[in-house]
């Protein structure tokens, strides 16, 4: 077995993401069967963590949900991505303040609204609509202001 039940270390699980050379590999996307298996081993091996799971839940069943915008990724050239696995930039720290960038990111419904699914590795509709642009990568992220339409933003 890869995992030991009585070890004191944590193992971070990341699901496969259709990005880079795997951008069109839809078959790798985590499905209901995969999620059920992950829930099963989470309960069995209490040292497993995922970014979407609640780490303080002693029953090992709680879901925090996707943490886009809450955990940003800043590239060496200053592009601010909503997640290292979602290759969409919401701004650039050399052009805007981080507060302006975060405020803009939370105006996008997909990032503001709760999702139990990892947008990058589980939400097939989000992946098809926003993560499959030609040449899109961590080095050439899609620009949120260009790919999202008016209906994708919250109204104030």
Give, region by region, the residue ranges found by the protein language model.
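Radical SAM enzyme [4Fe-4S]-AdoMet core and its adjacent flexible, acidic
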Residues: 1-68, 74-81, 85, 91, ...
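Flexible mid-to-C-terminal extensions adjoining Fe-S/redox cofactors in radical SAM and related proteins
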Residues: 80, 85-156
């Amino acid at each position: 077995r890869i995992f030991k039940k009585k070890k004191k270390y944590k193992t971070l699980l990341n699901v496969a993401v259709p990005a880079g050379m795997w951008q069109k590999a839809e078959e790798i996307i985590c499905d209901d069967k995969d999620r059920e298996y992950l829930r099963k081993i989470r309960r069995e091996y209490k040292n497993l963590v995922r970014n979407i799971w609640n780490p303080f839940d002693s029953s090992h069943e709680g879901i925090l949900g996707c943490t886009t915008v809450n955990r940003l990724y800043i590239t060496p050239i200053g592009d601010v991505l909503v997640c290292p696995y979602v290759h969409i930039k919401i701004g650039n720290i050399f052009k805007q303040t981080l507060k302006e960038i975060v405020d803009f990111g939370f105006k996008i419904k997909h990032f503001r609204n709760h999702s139990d699914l990892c947008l990058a590795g589980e939400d097939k509709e989000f992946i098809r609509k926003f993560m499959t642009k030609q040449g899109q990568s961590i080095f050439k992220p899609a620009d949120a202001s260009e790919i999202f339409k008016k209906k994708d933003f919250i109204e104030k």
